[in-house]
Design a protein with these regions (language model features):
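Conserved N-terminal beta-strand and adjoining loop/helix that marks the start
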Residues: 1-21, 41
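Short connector loops at helix/strand junctions that flank enzyme active sites
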Residues: 4, 34, 89-93
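Conserved Nudix-box catalytic region and its N-terminal flanking loop in Nudix hydrolases
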Residues: 18-62
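Generic C-terminal helix-cap and adjacent flexible tail
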Residues: 139-145
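A short coil-to-beta-strand element that immediately follows conserved catalytic motifs
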Residues: 60-72
Length: 145
């Protein structure tokens, strides 16, 4: 059963000593966003993030990082929400970054993908939660170098 939380996953890789971030275009509404999805049953946040990344891109990453960036989303957006009595109005969206080395093989949830530098990704992303998470990842990577 769908768990009452959402995960947002930003894969990144280094090309010519610069960070590139993977964003994908959703088939259902055409927006550019990070990889995302809901937890299932008793999955941990990290288990859900790894599963979503694999299901939607066939990627396996390393250096997983749970970010400080998170937001709350209206639960009415998600099927089965009437079972989530402990969350009467909203559910949390937890964000992750993950380092990858390969290109994705997209599931049918997406029509296209791009490896973007920070500025291009910020301009293409539709949702504030995605832009906030990407800002945090970019800051973490910049400060680590």
């Amino acid at each position: 059963m769908r768990a009452p939380f959402q995960v947002l996953v930003f894969p990144y890789k280094t090309v010519d000593n610069k960070s590139r971030f993977l964003i994908a275009r959703r088939r259902d509404n055409g927006v550019w966003q990070a990889i995302s999805g809901g937890g299932e049953d008793n999955e941990s946040l990290l288990e859900a993030a790894k599963r979503e990344l694999s299901e939607e891109t066939q990627l396996v990453g390393c250096n997983w990082q749970l970010l400080d960036s998170m937001c709350m989303l209206p639960k009415v957006f998600y099927a089965g929400n009437h079972y989530w009595t402990e969350h009467p109005f909203v559910i949390p969206e937890h964000s992750f970054s993950v380092k990858v080395t390969e290109d994705p093989q997209l599931s049918n949830e997406h029509t296209d993908y791009r490896w973007c530098d920070y500025q291009e990704a910020i301009e293409l992303l539709t949702y504030d939660s995605n832009r906030n998470a990407l800002w945090e990842i970019n800051e973490r990577l910049y400060k680590a170098s």
